[in-house]
């Protein structure tokens, strides 16, 4: 199934970053929380969007919500 395939496509870190994004955290705040650089945060977001086949963080969040990968 498509949903099962997509469920395993993102890394734990990518899911973690989107969980923080929906909590209204900035890239800078996420970097500080996870002890990684802002560039690394942006790379994770970009990689996740590419894997999900979407453009933009909001579209990625919608897709992750549909897949029950993150929750509000």
Question: Where in the sequence are the language-model features?
Answer:
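Helix-turn-helix DNA-binding segment
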Residues: 1-40, 67
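Short linear sequence elements within intrinsically disordered, low-complexity coil regions
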Residues: 23, 48-49
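Basic, Lys/Arg-enriched C-terminal extension of HTH/homeodomain DNA-binding domains
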Residues: 49-72
